[in-house]
């Protein structure tokens, strides 16, 4: 090796000790949170950005080992996506470059969109942990509310092993899991007292879907919120396809709703 390159020598034991120590410190810190967001797609990461920017302790769980949700797949794997106003203001705030194609309509590169959205959320103070699946919620009575989540390693679930989860508390839980609204679905099935009915997502009607998804983002039951494509599933709205304005605006709106609700609680 060249004498001009001085690489710090660190053995395998130290590597393991540092990783385990710092990881456990993070988990101990994030057992209690202001907000837990399930899903690191465009809505989840937008929500994380605005919540953390406001000073709320925000934790995002993502079952995969990557960011972005549906951004990366784009439209039939094409690497360009559509953003419409006023969502462009959110992307500009995060220094994501846009190409204007007509008044109020922009094209964004999917890789840049994912990377800078994640970086913005992290820089604002949100913690994102990959490879973790949320498979249940915590609830409380008097008053009835959702009070956190149960989590398991995604790899453990994929292996089909019977392993109990650990519990993470939160004043607000956001389902940003996408088309299946997985967290709300579990709460609906296992806590019928919440009175949640899920009509399911409808077929495509982009103009209607973009508007209604943002408008109907918000609380589903005390302590439980929906954002992004989870909104279409829970509210019975149409899908919109590879136009992502409503996703980032939905994330921003759910953050604003939670900030207001926690302030008033």
Curated annotation (Swiss-Prot):
Nuclease found in the keyword field: no
Residues annotated as binding Fe cation are 164, 179
EC category name: transferase
Q: What SUPFAM superfamilies does its record include?
A: FAD/NAD(P)-binding domain
Known function:
Involved in the biosynthesis of the thiazole moiety of thiamine. Catalyzes the conversion of NAD and glycine to adenosine diphosphate 5-(2-hydroxyethyl)-4-methylthiazole-2-carboxylate (ADT), an adenylated thiazole intermediate, using free sulfide as a source of sulfur.
State whether it acts alone or in a complex, and with which partners, per the record.
Homooctamer; tetramer of dimers.
Give the protein's recorded name.
Thiamine thiazole synthase
Q: Which organism is it from?
A: Sulfolobus acidocaldarius (strain ATCC 33909 / DSM 639 / JCM 8929 / NBRC 15157 / NCIMB 11770)
Q: Which gene encodes it?
A: thi4
